[in-house]
Curated annotation (Swiss-Prot):
GO terms for molecular function: ATP binding; nicotinate-nucleotide adenylyltransferase activity. The keyword NAD applies. InterPro entries: Cyt_trans-like (IPR004821), NadD/NMNAT (IPR005248), Rossmann-like_a/b/a_fold (IPR014729). The gene is nadD. It comes from the Bacteria. Pathway: Cofactor biosynthesis; NAD(+) biosynthesis; deamido-NAD(+) from nicotinate D-ribonucleotide: step 1/1. This is Probable nicotinate-nucleotide adenylyltransferase. Keywords: ATP-binding, NAD, Nucleotide-binding, Nucleotidyltransferase, Pyridine nucleotide biosynthesis, Transferase. Catalyzes the reversible adenylation of nicotinate mononucleotide (NaMN) to nicotinic acid adenine dinucleotide (NaAD). GO terms for biological process: NAD biosynthetic process. NCBIfam families: cyt_tran_rel, nicotinate (nicotinamide) nucleotide adenylyltransferase, PRK00071.1-3, PRK00071.1-4.
Amino acid sequence: MRKIGIIGGTFDPPHYGHLLIANEVYHALNLEEVWFLPNQIPPHKQGRNITSVESRLHMLELATEAEEHFSICLEELSRKGPSYTYDTMLQLTKKYPDVQFHFIIGGDMVEYLPKWYNIEALLNLVTFVGVARPGYTLHTPYKITTVEIPEFAVSSSLLRERYKEKKTCKYLLPEKVQVYIERNGLYES
C-alpha cells in the first residue's frame, strides 16, 4: 500500500511554512509523496475575499516545482461550492484504493476537528497527522499521528497583511511566488 500525505489549504499565498510542514512529515512518516490540495471554498472561510483559483494554483506550482516528492491534487478545484474534506477524501480513496492517505493538519485544525463535517466517517478514510503550531495544542478526542517540526511562525494571513503594509516578505515564501505576487499586485489593498 502506498503512503501519500495530503496538505490542504487555500494557499493564499503558499509559503515556506507549508513547504516545511510537508517536507518534515514526508520524511518523518516515510511517505512516497505529499500532495498539496488547494481548496475551492473552505467551509470555515466562506464569505472571505480569497485570491482567484488561477493565481493561487499558479503560486502553488511555483512553490512546489523544485521538489520531486511534492505534487498538486486538483480534486477540490473541480467542484463548485464549499470544499468538505470528507467528500474529497471519499473521492480520492475510491480513485486510489491502493493508497493510505495521511491528512496533514496544523494545531489550529486539530482543535477544530470535532466540528469537521462527517468527522467520524472521515476518520475511517484517512490517518490525521497533526503538527504543532504556535499558540495551539494537539489535544483532540480523536486518534491522530503527531509530527514534531521546527517552529516557523509564518501564515498566509500574516503575509497578506505584510504585503498590504508594504513590508518585506523576503525569506518567508519562495522567491518565484514573491515575484508573481508583486508583478500581479496581489494583496496590495
